[in-house]
Amino acid sequence: MDKELLKKLTDEGIELLKNLIRTPSVSRNEDKTAELIFNYLKDHGVADVRRHLNNVWAISKDFDANKPTILFNSHHDTVLPAKTYTRDPFSPDVEDGVLYGLGSNDAGGPAINLLTNFLYFYGRQLPYNLIVAITAEEENSGENGVMSILDKLPPIEFAVVGEPTCMEISVAEKGILVLDCTAHGKTGHAARNTGINAIYKALDDINWLRNYKFEKSSPWLGDVKCTVTGVNAGTLHNVIPAECTFMVDVRITEKYTHQEVLDIIRQNIPNKDTEVKPRSFKLKSSHIDENHPFIKLAAAKGFKLFGSPTTSDRAVMPYASLKMGPGDSNRSHTADEYILLSEIREGVEKTVELFEEFFGR
């Protein structure tokens, strides 16, 4: 490991992160941070840097189509700053080794980690091609984010998705299926024994969703989880409602497809006339085999493996992927977001060391 070069690149990456924090980049409004990242790669001598919308990616020097390709991907968009911030969310203040600012942790630190790794290995003779893509619209799962460039990339063997995981490696990640459901009844006067109360029918369905256990359980992600997150019915106190709508958040493991989960719910929900409509099948569960050579090496070197209940851009990738990066997901979307500079430095060094050994197998 060239520690002098790595320190230089890490220091420069931290300065880029400070500039990213200074530059608002809420989802769909990342044009200025995309420009910063594009110019940063160009300024470091990267020949092939590309941009589509607010997505920026760079390709290995001397790209060889006969070699497999690894994708490094993270995002540069942020959520809106929480109203409870006590600091300026766009001021990259450093105090006692702590860097504050919106996007510092999610996913600035992880993005800098992957950019620095790409630059460290740039121009070296490796058994793999590398592509680094720092993309937009991750926070809102937007169509103009990473999914808009997947067809512009060469075949990918596996992807490393940068998110704050305390440098642990997520080998599996739950997908999301949102269901809009409507229970049907019959209107009537509340004072009489007429009508069919759609709320009561919905309660039967909701209780079933709450208690149903899917047959297959994942060793990394546990069970499929259904959570009712919204209910709406009725407008007048004396009228039995003929409809009750409810919204369901379903977290899916790699053991099921979206269609399989939808079919099971439709076939087993107590009221067969209840409409169950999926919003999208886009955000799939993701997984990389724990016997994959990279995962086996990481585990042997002491990296902790885990299954993640939250989603990332892995959900739209059609190939094996893992999630890792400096920072802590518990800080994401919180007021006074921060990352430790030591987390970035140690994360970069650990990642470079891991890939050096992987490339040298």
Residue ranges and their predicted role:
Residues M1-P81, E243-M247, I264, L341-V352, ...:
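N-terminal helical capping/dimerization or prosegment-like subdomains
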Residues G108-V178, T182, S218:
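Acidic/histidine-rich catalytic neighborhood of metal-dependent amide-processing enzymes
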Residues K67-I131, L341:
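Active-site metal-coordination/substrate-binding segment of hydrolases
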Residues I37, A111-F121, V146-I149, A202-D205, ...:
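Buried hydrophobic packing segments
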Residues V49, L99-A107, L305-S312:
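Active-site nucleophile and cofactor-binding loops and adjacent substrate-binding regions
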Residues V49, P92-V94, V228-V231:
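A structural signal for short hydrophobic beta-strand segments in well-ordered beta-sheet cores
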Residues I70-F72, A133, F158-V160, L322-M324:
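Hydrophobic/aromatic beta-strand patches that form the interior of the parallel beta-sheet core
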Residues K8, V171, D180-R361:
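Metal-dependent amide/peptide-bond hydrolase catalytic core
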